[in-house]
Amino acid sequence: MADNRIYNFSAGPSMLPVPVLERCAADMLNYQGSGMSVMEMSHRSKVYDGIIKETEATLRRVLSIPDNYKVLFLQGGATTQFAAIPMNLLKTGKADYALTGSFASKAYKEAQKFGDMHAAFSSKETNFDHVPTQDELDIRPDADYFYICANNTIYGTKYNYVPETGD
């Protein structure tokens, strides 16, 4: 199997080591000897609860998450996070976005449901070919937050600096 592996350097999923894939394949049929796949077990089962507890412990250890913080396992992916940002950060109802690619544009569109969103920059007319310099940004001083997508894998652009936003 390892001789004909394809190297995948695209955005998103990437190559995994063969031993990892083999363990996943075995667990897909019989997760750690439980007699069932993770896809088949109840989210209320002891085995599944063990998966969640082990995952949380690993996250806390690797990321140094203190005990006074909760670890949440939520569904939804990026689109849900695009809504969660304004739902949690908007205070006065104003936020600024730099539209530099697909994700930033989707985040901006979702955020518009929650308040007064302002495009502080857009490179859409040039097919998202660059991120702004500090001087190109039109950040409002009364915005609750300023949103950027730091790495635009579809268009191959990224920020090499953290924009100054004021207080």
Which role does the model predict for each range below?
Residues 5-56:
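A glycine-/small-polar-enriched, mobile loop at the entrance of the PLP active site in fold-type I
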Residues 12, 111, 123-167:
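Active-site phosphate-binding strand-loop segment of PLP-dependent enzymes
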Residues 4, 68, 92-94, 142-143, ...:
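A general structural motif
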Residues 36-81, 88, 102, 110:
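Conserved N-terminal alpha-helix of the aminotransferase class I/II PLP-enzyme fold
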Residues 17, 81-83, 104-105, 155-156:
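Short, well-ordered alpha-helical microsegments
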Residues 115-122:
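A glycine-rich helix N-cap at a beta->alpha junction
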Residues 90-105:
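Conserved PLP-anchoring active-site segment centered on the Schiff-base-forming lysine
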Residues 74-76, 97-101, 148-151:
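Short His-Asn-centered micro-motif
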